[in-house]
């Protein structure tokens, strides 16, 4: 990152709580080269991990970059699966096999080991797991704010933000 106008940085506590799966490696840059040599995010001016999941519009090819000339918000199959998992659980106040299958499909695609998959059938614990999974899966896709408002969690999460930003 060059600390220019198009760089995007992540909340460190969110980064530290992010599962060590394939998404984390793709979504974040934690070290990079500068004109002064190799640095880690903790050595950088902002001391924050860089968000690196955007398309490289200048070069016309996908790549890892903390810069984005335009943020592409999309709805993905993972979004549909997690919406289903949450909605069916809230509608019936129970976790059915299809809801478990939906969240586990997202987790398996992300590279979770079998023992890391969500297996709870407690509705409260399950909806919390879905909320967390949505945060990790849709990191920096501009969905988090709406999740926080919808679930009335803004004040709960705001205390953990850097510089008052709820970018995730």
Predicted regions, residues:
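Polar, glycine-rich mid-to-C-terminal structural blocks
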Residues: 1-14
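Acidic/polar-rich alpha-helix caps and helix-coil junctions
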Residues: 20-168
